[in-house]
Curated annotation (Swiss-Prot):
Organism of this sequence: Rickettsia prowazekii (strain Madrid E)
Record-linked CDD domains: FtsZ_type1
Gene symbol of the encoding locus: ftsZ
Keywords from the named record: Cell cycle, Cell division, Cytoplasm, GTP-binding, Nucleotide-binding, Septation
Quaternary structure, from the entry: Homodimer. Polymerizes to form a dynamic ring structure in a strictly GTP-dependent manner. Interacts directly with several other division proteins.
Compartments where located: Cytoplasm
Name of this protein: Cell division protein FtsZ
Length: 452
């Protein structure tokens, strides 16, 4: 009797991280990461432009929408980009299978990235993959149409990703100077993605005292909405604090403050000379910035012999909410007929509803925009004055005079009608309803209303 006994094959159990570049911008980002020899991640690029795809350094390439675009690109149409991705859904699904985490990088505002990225994100989510979007927004000089296209693409993409990081290209001017080349500027934006991926992979593959597993990372990044990534390196005195400061103040990101973040992933990497106190100082500085006692903060520390004398701090903050109240959309106070005092500090005031001002048939007071310069002018001298006498509605008990909103409406109308009024002083008076000196209120002719 012969027994055939085979030793079990060595199975490497480790999370698979995929960086998926979409369109021209996404492909360029992947090329830069390959140039930088990033370890611990697989790379895939997908494009509708066959020529651009051919020049990619990535081995795994997907030609999107062969029948839809014939390799000629999406023509800046997100609809075409989406159709191309849907046509190539099987290839996309195959490239993502067995991945535990995927970073989808693209440029918003064009055709392929804007249209295809949400489709790829949806497929990743259907496969149960932790999905992170890292995308750019156009420069201002690229025009309003491209910016609107980008915003629509972001809304679509955010439905399918666990975490979304937005890098406005316009923010490159914060760190660039007159000598910065165009290529170097885009590499700065790509470095945000590079640093974020490296921060995650280092925690799992680099040796260290405090290593994290993939479940820790998933706990911080799953279903967390908007996020920011940052990294900082420093040497010399106070290197840990300085590196942490650089990591938490990334000038390129759309949401550059991690205050109030619900999840935080911290990776502090250094050489064998890194001390306990330095790790403590860096971690505490980030915790202070987050300022949320309920935040899920996951910390790891690894060693890298190449960083002798240097400390690198990487941070991923997730669950960063957008502004709760849109700017310049303030309601008028029902009790005083006036705007909140802080309104006057804004450059533009947009009123969407006015409930307590009397209605006039000849003019609608809805959706009025008033420039601050037409409201906050100082009027002096004896030039012609505009006097508006308006019955007080819901008059305050103390009878104190309030700046009437109707006066601001009238001033806006005078300006928009190109009437030449040398504005020196606007006097807005409140007249007691019992004052019956005149049967007609002293207001502009087209607003006149006889007393009942």
């Amino acid at each position: 009797m012969v027994l055939n006994i085979k030793a079990p094959e060595n199975i490497v159990l480790k999370p698979t991280i995929t960086v998926f570049g979409v369109g021209g911008a996404g492909s360029n980002a992947v090329n830069n990461m390959i140039h930088a020899n990033l370890q611990g991640a697989n790379f895939v690029v997908a494009n509708t432009d066959a020529q651009s795809l051919e020049h990619s350094l990535c081995i795994n390439k997907i030609q999107l929408g062969v029948s839809t675009t014939r390799g000629l690109g999406a023509g800046a149409s997100p609809e075409v980009g989406a159709l191309a991705a849907q046509e190539s859904e099987n290839e996309i699904r195959s490239s993502l299978e067995n991945s535990n985490m995927v970073f989808i990088t693209a440029g918003m505002g064009g055709g392929t990235g804007t249209g295809s990225a949400p489709i790829i994100a949806r497929i990743a989510k259907e496969l149960g993959i932790l999905t992170v979007g890292v995308v750019t927004k156009p420069f201002h000089f690229e025009g309003g149409h491209r910016m609107k296209t980008a915003d629509k693409g972001l809304i679509e993409l955010q439905q399918f990703v666990d975490t979304l990081i937005v890098i406005p290209n316009q923010n490159l001017f914060r760190i660039a100077n007159e000598q910065t080349t165009f290529a170097d500027a885009f590499k700065m934006a790509d470095d945000v993605l590079h640093a974020g991926v490296r921060g995650v992979t280092d925690l799992m593959i680099m040796p260290g005292l405090i290593n994290l597993d993939f479940a820790d990372i998933k706990a911080v990044m799953s279903e967390m909405g908007k996020a920011m990534m940052g990294t900082g390196e420093d040497s010399g005195e106070d290197r840990a604090i300085k590196a942490a400061e650089s990591a938490i103040s990334n000038p390129l990101l759309d949401h550059s403050s991690m205050c109030g973040a619900r999840g935080v992933l911290i990776n502090i990497t250094g050489g064998p000379d890194m001390t306990l106190f330095e790790v403590d100082n860096a971690a505490n500085r980030i915790r202070e910035e987050v300022d949320n006692i309920d935040a899920n903060i996951i910390f790891g520390s690894t060693f890298n012999p190449e960083l002798k004398g240097i400390i690198r701090v990487s941070v991923v903050a997730t669950g960063i909410d957008a502004d709760k109240v849109p700017k310049y959309k303030l309601a008028i106070d029902k009790n005083t007929n006036t705007l909140p005092e802080e309104t006057y500090n804004e450059s533009i005031i947009q009123h969407t509803q006015i409930e307590t001002i009397p209605s006039f048939n000849s003019y609608s007071t809805e959706n009025i925009e008033i420039n601050e310069s037409s409201i906050k002018q100082d009027y002096t001298g004896n030039e012609q004055e505009l006097r508006l006498h308006v019955n007080a509605v819901n008059k305050p008990e103390n009878n104190s005079q309030k700046s009437s909103f109707l006066g601001k409406i009238w001033e806006s109308l005078r300006t928009s009608n190109n009437q030449t009024l040398e504005r020196k002083n606007v006097i807005v008076n409140t007249v007691d309803q019992d004052n019956k000196e005149s049967d007609i209120h002293d207001i502009p002719a087209f607003l006149r209303k006889k007393r009942d």
